[in-house]
Amino acid sequence: MKNTLSSMILDDSTIVAIATPIGVGAISIVRLSGEKAYHIALALTHKESLKPRYAHLCHIYDAQQMPIDEALVLYFPKPYSYTTQDVCEVQCHGGIVSARAIVQLCLKLGARMAQAGEFAKRAFLGGRLDLAQVQAVAGLIQSQSLEANKILMRQLKGDLGTFVNRTRENLLEILAFSEVHIDYSEEVEESYIRDIQQKLAYVENELSHIYHISLTRQSIIEGYTLSIIGKPNVGKSSLLNALLRYERAIVSEIEGTTRDTIEEMLTIKGSLLRIVDTAGIRESDDKIEQIGILKTKEALMRSNIIVAIFDGSRPFDAEDKAIMEILKTQCQNKYILVIINKSDLPLQCEEELLHNLLRLHNKALLCMPLHLSTKYEGVQKVLECLEEVVSTHNGDESMILTSSYQLDCIKKALECIVKAHNVLDIGQLELFSYQIQDCIESICKITHPYENAELLDRLFATFCLGK
């Protein structure tokens, strides 16, 4: 039997879970939701009542009526709670002993263990959150940058839901026109057709804008990836260490010291930057080094930013020119920063070759002479360039789709609009109506996936137990 969304009924059984990470800390939170949540909280605290939305300082008692902890207990009555059910939270002392003991007491008093994401699932089924807001919650839990949080908070506040509803209303207006005139399509005046085409073009432009701007700004959500490339011993690991301000990679005069990619995280202007120090690119018979070079090329493919380092104290050789060819042919849609290292020594390389290369590149940043020392000197210019890249995307008030599911829904809606234009041009109003209906369905799936619940099950399974 197909698992449809209509078959998913809001379950009022009482669930319990620890909502905070397990381990040593100031507090742990045990969360309850369901019909017995309030009565279980009263049994735990020996209170006759709990005032809604107030923090009550209480002792927590075990089955032998002995106090096992002191905690703050909060009660949120339905429907004005996260799950739209009665919800109680017990904020006990941190660590694992108290929280686990309280969970066991709740189980004995009639609760069951919550499944992963079950609290958020109940919030969705109860109408507290739409699917876009649920995905925003999941994104906030996994977020690794402040800029991503800002985007996800817009989605959590309901901005995407508002956009979906507005688009749906515009499409319904277009659909109503076509439905009325289906039986008299030969008699429809051209002015009405032009009016519908204009309204549909407006919807198409809005959807196309949000789709393409979301594609170009996924790095804000997922983080930027920067790969440092160059032949062996040109200063790649020195740059990584300088950016991180500590000795992460071994720096040696021996060529080929870095044989594998090294990845580290850095936050710039509120955005996450994954820095990949790659193995030097050169011809090699060493099998291990060959694997490292292959990983370097794979890192290039998934990077947004490439920092290419060349040794300015030596003339360019075949390996340098091979790297230039990679920049020219494989990195056209990536930001490129070129560093001519060892600028403290007399310049021997053909600097003009690099300038000519960057002039042909649509996302070239800068070609700079630099002296990368073990004292982390000279890195400020590099940081300024990286801040410039991040700043071009951050701070934009445009709404951004934050998941591949949302992007796919918009893409399918745009495909329906293209087909709708085509059949409208030849006067096929019935086929036009079908395409508009499909378009509405695709748009609405962003917030309310009516077809089946498997997507929801997969999504909620990615949540932690207490969310």
UniProtKB/Swiss-Prot annotation:
Location in the cell: Cytoplasm
Keyword Cytoplasm included in the entry's annotation: yes
Molecular function, one GO term: GTP binding
Residues that hold K(+) according to the record: 233, 252, 254, 257
Record-level GO cellular component terms: cytosol
PROSITE patterns: G_TRME (PS51709)
InterPro entries hit by this protein: G_TrmE (IPR031168), GTP-bd (IPR006073), GTP-bd_TrmE_N (IPR018948), GTPase_MnmE (IPR004520), MnmE_dom2 (IPR027368), MnmE_helical (IPR025867), P-loop_NTPase (IPR027417), Small_GTP-bd (IPR005225)
Cofactor: K(+)
EC number: 3.6.-.-
UniProt KW keywords: Cytoplasm, GTP-binding, Hydrolase, Magnesium, Metal-binding, Nucleotide-binding, Potassium, tRNA processing
Binding site for Mg(2+): 237, 258
Function, in words: Exhibits a very high intrinsic GTPase hydrolysis rate. Involved in the addition of a carboxymethylaminomethyl (cmnm) group at the wobble position (U34) of certain tRNAs, forming tRNA-cmnm(5)s(2)U34.
Record text on subunit structure and interactions: Homodimer. Heterotetramer of two MnmE and two MnmG subunits.
Stated family: Belongs to the TRAFAC class TrmE-Era-EngA-EngB-Septin-like GTPase superfamily. TrmE GTPase family.
The protein's name: tRNA modification GTPase MnmE
